[in-house]
C-alpha cells in the first residue's frame, strides 16, 4: 500500500503523523533528508525544530543527504529504512539534487513498493507531479533543471504555511498569481495540517492547538 504524510511543518504535526502510521515509532527507522536546507542561508532553527519534533515522538532517526549520491547508494543506505522523510528548504535545489542522483526515480519505486514517505514544506511540495506553479519564487537552478516535474507521488501540489505571517508576501505577491488557474490541483495547508495518503485516497488532518 502506498502511504504518504505531507505536512506544512512536521515539527507541529509529528505526533499526528506518528499516530496515523499506526506503529510504534521507536520501531520505525527513518531517514531524515535535509538536502533542501543546504543552500539556505541564515538561521536554520526550523530545521532543528523539524528534526527534534520527529525525535520527540520517538522515531529512530538519522540524517541523510542525497547530494552527490547515486541510486546504488540509496539501495545500500536506505533499502532497510521504514520511512523516508524529506524536509524543507529550497524546493528547486532539492529537485536538482534528486535528478542528479536518481533519487526521484528511486523514491517513486520505493513508495510504490510500500516504503512510507513523509514530507515537510519543500518535501511535501516536491511530491507533486510538477512544481512549476511555484517557480516565480526562486529563479535559482532554473537553467540546470529546464523542466519542473516533481516526484509524481500524488496528483496534487501542496502549498504549505498558509496563514503564516512570514510567508504572506510570497503568497500574495508571487505564488497565488502564478497558481490561480483551473488546471492546478492545489491543497493549502496551515502549519497544523498535513495530508495523509493511502493509495489514491487522501484527506487533510489537523492537530489541535
What are these regions (language model features)?
Residues 6, 63, 85-86, 117-120, ...:
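General beta-strand structural signal in soluble alpha/beta enzymes
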Residues 58, 81, 114, 154-155, ...:
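Short, well-ordered alpha-helix to beta-strand connector turns
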Residues 92, 124-127, 194-196:
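Short, active-site-adjacent cap segments at secondary-structure transitions
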